[in-house]
Amino acid sequence: MVSRVLVANRGEIARRVFATCRRLGLGTVAVYTEPDAAAPHVAEADARVRLAKTNDYLNAEAIIAAARAAGADAIHPGYGFLSENADFAAAVADAGLTWVGPPVDAVRAMGSKIESKKLMASAGVPVLDELGPDSVTQAQLPVLVKASAGGGGRGMRVVRELSALAGEVAAAQREAQSAFGDPTVFCERYLPTGHHVEVQVLADNHGTVWAVGERECSIQRRHQKIIEEAPSPLVERIPGMRAKLFDAARLAASAIGYAGAGTVEFLADDSPGREGEFFFLEMNTRLQVEHPVTEETTGLDLVELQLAVADGERLDVEPPAAQGHSIEARLYAEDPAHGWQPQAGLVHAFDVPGSRAEFAALGQRTGIRLDSGIVDGSVVSIHYDPMLAKVISYAPTRRLAALVLADALARTRLHGLRTNRELLVNVLRHQAFLDGATDTAFFDTHGLAQLSAPLSDEGVVRLSAIAAALADAAHNRARAAVFGSLPSGWRNLTSGYQVKTFTDDQNNKHRIEYRFTRTGLVLAADEAVQLVSSAPDEVVLADANGVACRFAVARYGDDVYVDSARGPVHLNVVPRFPEPGSSVAKGSLVAPMPGNVIRLGAQVGDSVTTGQPLIWLEAMKMEHTITAPADGVLRSLNVTTGQQVEVGAVLAIVEDPESQAKGDS
């Protein structure tokens, strides 16, 4: 019997496994690297072992040594990292430890997407034909380049022009090597408006194979899921599709002697004349990021069942029937409006008001579950995936589940990093999503710019700026030693106004001019706003109709976050007397995020053209290309391969030939 479990992972999945282990009375062991030293999963474990290097979550020997040192008798791989590495699974078993996962042969069979598709085809599971990167023709475009190992959108590229194929294959190979330790890639036909539908399977070592339920994960960015749900709206509307999917999934699991939790992923088509067709993509021989939606609709604890199967227990003949609807939103530290740029830094505050459960099912009661890898004060590193948390809803109907989740995200208190929160809320409230029209081209169809729009309109931003100014005044008043009883900004000369200026995330400037008189607040602008009350962290304002709204205000240096029922607002304080500083030279290439320079595409003195790739950055295991802003000459190059850079650093300068000629004359 398992008694102490080491989780060979980090973040929210480590916390998720620990939660079940604690409920079952099992000991827990965390491994961590230096960037994760203060992470929540480390603090919550009964024992913790430090790994020497930032990439040691991929070091099988180090993890097994940690298990032995901490007295663990089982290893749970989580997902990502080594979770689908057959050699790691074999090494765990050879070390005399229990592997909380499928048999080694099953992991190996599914570890290569190339070989697994051949195996599934021979077993009678429908598959898309594989294409060799060297044999793709113009007629076969568009194609999808995919890493043979791993997942999560890494090592994946869509290619629409044959001339771009070689470069995209090379980039996918580098990403795959960095993320999974295996650079092998292949190509397959790309369906631009397909549906990503998957089946959760669970099998024991006694011949029972469950198809627990399906999920749809078609809302994706960079081929990585961001909204997942159960059941699938596509499957719900096509008669007979669920039974065929379940049969194919059970067939896939049985063909490789599977045991434990796994997911069989399919690409489904609903174009005219092909409705309900589906093709095997891959089998993930591990727990999925999106497993909570299956737990919510079935009432199962999939981690508990993984542990039970690892202990040799039998499953019931049939799984429980699914009920209701569950949707999961992945909260990422990234900026969708600017190329999905990952963000890194300090999380000042994080709270999802009204969440009723953490890392556990809601008991099929309408509400919100939170599976988070962060808490107040967490630091998001450039070294790992930018997912901060998963916010999950459950409700009797899909529409209610979507609206409950959107409301919870909109009310979430999240200070310190730019995230995809606005995108998630706008998608969940979009009529097309509510109607179930959710294919993989959702962002292209409905416009990423519109879907990334702020949740708060201009009027709310203006009110939030007023609230921020008055909260600052209350803060100053509280600090005043002599005139602490007087309103901040009160003057014997009543004509004087206090001024506070902010910029919002759209670079709009908000100048707030106010003064306090013996009769109350006066604003210089013609704004029908009344002050009900003010404190350093809370201001209540009323509009012309007397409707009051509470604004919670938090300031961290020059960053101000204002949360209200009308929407979240982030502001920056504009100093009254800006410090003199050097401006960035024209043609400068500025790092849009912190990261590591992994490749350079030109040398100083080279002529470059608009859009030409010049510098490749790696951040959070994804490549990001910095291109030339205009035709010109690379005048300076301030970085070298392997160098780590901070956001805002000037990497290089491209100068147009005329400017260079003037400078030389």
Residue ranges, per PLM feature:
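N-terminal beta-alpha lobe that positions the nucleotide/phosphoryl donor
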Residues: 1-264, 268-291
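C-terminal amphipathic alpha-helical interaction region
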Residues: 543, 563-564, 604, 612
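Short, well-ordered beta-strand elements within core beta-sheets of diverse protein domains
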Residues: 156-158, 233-237, 387-396, 411, ...
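Catalytic P-loop NTP-binding/switch module of NTPases
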Residues: 548, 554-592
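Structured functional modules or segments
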Residues: 579-665
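Catalytic cores of soluble metabolic enzymes centered on carboxylation/carboxyl-transfer
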Residues: 292-295, 300-524, 643-653, 659, ...
